[in-house]
């Protein structure tokens, strides 16, 4: 059996040079995300969300980005979940995208706010029926006796609302408003490229970090 400490990889897929990087992090992110989508990478929209509890204990989970623009990065979830509870007490979070094939990582930090009810309603209504029922069926992050509990909850919701279940009041969107972005491109000899964008007095400042 190969020892995990002996696993090696040479990073040679690309480079990240200031001369060709975008002036704003949102444009740089859009460029990389569109390239990941065009390359057919598996779930290029998957991102890790890191939150911290009131007593300083961090936790992470993978969710799917559902929108991004000049206001921030959007995803949807159960507000009563662990991440929801932690964001209620500490509204700062970090996101990470890892596109393995392209040897790229994007890290984003900032303050998190809820999306408007109108935004949450619009996205919820666009989801498949099973997903809308699932938002009612799952008491996310809470212990349950068995999977049968979820199935029964979904069936009960379907019987009550039919084809048009409303959005649960405990389910909706979050938007991370970035104040820091970092773009990492793997390079040969572990001399990786790292560019960071920091928001200072309303202006994005870009600088290179040592790998």
From Swiss-Prot:
Q: What is its EC number?
A: 1.4.3.5
Task: Name a single GO biological process.
Answer: pyridoxine biosynthetic process
Q: Which Pfam families match?
A: PNP_phzG_C (PF10590), PNPOx_N (PF01243)
Residues that hold substrate according to the record = 8-11, 66, 123, 127, 131, 190-192
Give TM regions: none
Q: Name one GO molecular function term.
A: pyridoxamine phosphate oxidase activity
What does it do?
A: Catalyzes the oxidation of either pyridoxine 5'-phosphate (PNP) or pyridoxamine 5'-phosphate (PMP) into pyridoxal 5'-phosphate (PLP).
Q: What is this protein called?
A: Pyridoxine/pyridoxamine 5'-phosphate oxidase
- Which lineage is the organism of this entry classified under, starting from the top rank? Bacteria, Pseudomonadati, Pseudomonadota, Betaproteobacteria, Burkholderiales
């Amino acid at each position: 059996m190969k020892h995990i400490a002996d696993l090696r990889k040479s990073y040679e897929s690309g480079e990240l040079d200031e001369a060709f990087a975008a002036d704003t992090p949102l444009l740089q992110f859009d460029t990389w995300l569109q390239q990941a989508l065009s390359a057919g990478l598996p779930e290029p929209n998957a991102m890790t969300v890191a939150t911290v509890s009131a007593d300083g204990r961090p936790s992470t989970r993978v969710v799917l980005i559902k929108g991004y623009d000049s206001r921030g990065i959007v995803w949807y979830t159960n507000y009563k979940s662990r991440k929801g509870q932690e964001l209620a007490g500490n509204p700062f979070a970090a996101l990470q995208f890892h596109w393995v094939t392209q040897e790229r990582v994007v890290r984003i930090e900032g303050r998190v706010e809820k999306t408007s009810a109108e935004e949450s309603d619009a996205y919820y209504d666009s989801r498949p029926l099973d997903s809308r029922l699932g938002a009612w069926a799952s008491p996310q992050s809470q212990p349950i006796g068995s999977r049968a509990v979820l199935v029964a909850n979904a069936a009960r919701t379907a019987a009550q609302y039919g084809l048009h279940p409303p959005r649960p009041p405990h389910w909706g969107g979050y938007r991370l408003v970035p104040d820091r972005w970092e773009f990492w491109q793997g390079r040969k000899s572990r001399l990786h490229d790292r560019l960071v964008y920091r928001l200072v007095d309303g202006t994005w400042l870009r600088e290179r970090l040592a790998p």
